């Protein structure tokens, strides 16, 4: 196993709802990261080819055409687009973790929020489907299964991934920790609105004025860092938090046809942006950098600019903390707790 792992986290926007162009961009980023000696290249949640932000900002009855386009621009796990990404991993000699909106072979409208970890020979090491789409995501994606709750054993270490809100699921995280995970990838969208900035008029029934802005909107930066750091501390592993970037083409697609375009635009502009960053096995920030004019430049995180963030990880640093809290070893009571995980792939029908 290599003593030092260099990870490249792509804080990048897709060509929104364009699978072919997004795939081409992903391949270019893989090659760029490989040229900077990365061993593992990571992409955000459903990088190919969009995250359905519109479902949080517009009523479902306004979004039929967007769902149709999302289906058209989603890809098969064994389709041409993912095959091209696999070839880029093979030709560049790197591992790739990439999120994508996955088409189902069983239905012409069923989608999954999925992620592949691809090996240096272009082989698929892990194919994970998000267990439960979160909140408004249920309008786009179907629930996955436990098949992808696996840690990839590679020449660069033991690497696992969970998608967005799955990093809130203690049992899913424990399942990864129990496979001796050394590097945990968490992937996130650029924004995740839980309310618009529009106020709701007084109720006709009780006369109480309620505002949808009451309480804080969802803060991707704080919420993601909290969950990612907690996992690193509990697992004594390194963390890669890779978030999407919202391009202008996404703004145009989300606002187009909205019944309240001003509200949608204002909310999109005001929402906190997610960040891409690295964590060490204590949950603390890990020093990271970008390349500017072929020179390293220290950078704690990426949030407001597209780029590739790099960090070097000494995987032996995962060992010391296990003396204190090995929650799948000496700090666990296996005589009390018993967790079983079904990792079978679930199909809608079995033909005999």
Language-model-detected regions and their locations in the chain:
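N-terminal glycine-/serine-/threonine-rich phosphate-binding loop
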Residues: 1-40
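Short beta-strand segments at enzyme active-site cores
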Residues: 39-45, 96-100, 240-242
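Generic short beta-strand
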Residues: 115-116, 122, 272, 276
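A short, polar/charged loop-to-alpha-helix boundary motif
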Residues: 130-144, 295-322
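Metal-dependent catalytic neighborhoods of phosphoester/phosphodiester hydrolases
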Residues: 47-64, 70, 107-108
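A conserved C-terminal secondary-structure "cap"
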Residues: 312-352
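Beta-strand-turn-beta hairpins that frame and shape the catalytic cleft
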Residues: 1-7, 151-160, 182-183
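CN hydrolase (nitrilase-like) catalytic-core segments centered on the catalytic cysteine
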Residues: 76-97, 167-309
């Amino acid at each position: 196993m290599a003593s030092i792992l260099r990870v490249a986290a792509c804080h990048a926007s897709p060509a929104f709802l364009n699978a072919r162009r997004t795939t081409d961009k992903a391949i270019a980023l893989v090659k760029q990261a490989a040229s900077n000696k990365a061993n593992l290249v990571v992409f955000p949640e459903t990088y190919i080819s969009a995250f359905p932000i519109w479902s949080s900002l517009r009523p479902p009855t306004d979004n039929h055409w967007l769902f149709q386009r999302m289906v058209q621009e989603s890809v098969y796990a064994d389709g041409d687009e993912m095959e091209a990404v696999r070839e880029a991993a093979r030709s560049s000699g790197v591992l790739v973790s990439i999120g994508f909106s996955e088409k189902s072979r069983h239905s012409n409208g069923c989608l999954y929020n999925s992620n592949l970890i691809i090996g240096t020979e272009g082989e698929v090491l892990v194919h994970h489907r998000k267990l439960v789409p979160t909140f408004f995501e249920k309008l786009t994606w179907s629930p996955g299964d436990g098949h992808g709750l696996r840690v990839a054993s590679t020449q660069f270490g033991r690497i696992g991934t969970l998608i967005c809100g799955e990093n809130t699921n203690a049992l899913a995280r424990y399942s990864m920790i129990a496979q001796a995970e050394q590097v945990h990838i968490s992937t996130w969208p650029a924004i995740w609105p839980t309310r618009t900035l529009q106020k709701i008029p007084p109720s006709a029934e009780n006369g109480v004025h309620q505002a949808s802005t009451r309480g804080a909107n969802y803060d991707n930066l704080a919420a993601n860092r909290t969950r990612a750091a907690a996992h690193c501390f509990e697992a004594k592993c390194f963390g890669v938090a890779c978030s999407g970037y919202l391009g202008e083409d996404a703004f145009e697609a989300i606002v187009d046809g909205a019944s309240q375009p001003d509200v949608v635009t204002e909310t999109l502009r005001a929402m906190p942006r997610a960040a891409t960053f690295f964590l060490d096995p204590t949950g603390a920030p890990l020093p990271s950098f970008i390349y500017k004019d072929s020179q390293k430049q220290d950078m704690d995180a990426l949030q407001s600019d597209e780029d590739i963030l790099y960090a070097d990880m000494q995987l032996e640093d995962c060992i010391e903390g296990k003396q204190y809290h090995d929650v799948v070893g000496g700090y666990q009571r296996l005589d009390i707790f018993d967790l079983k995980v079904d990792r079978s792939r679930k199909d809608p029908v079995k033909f005999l």
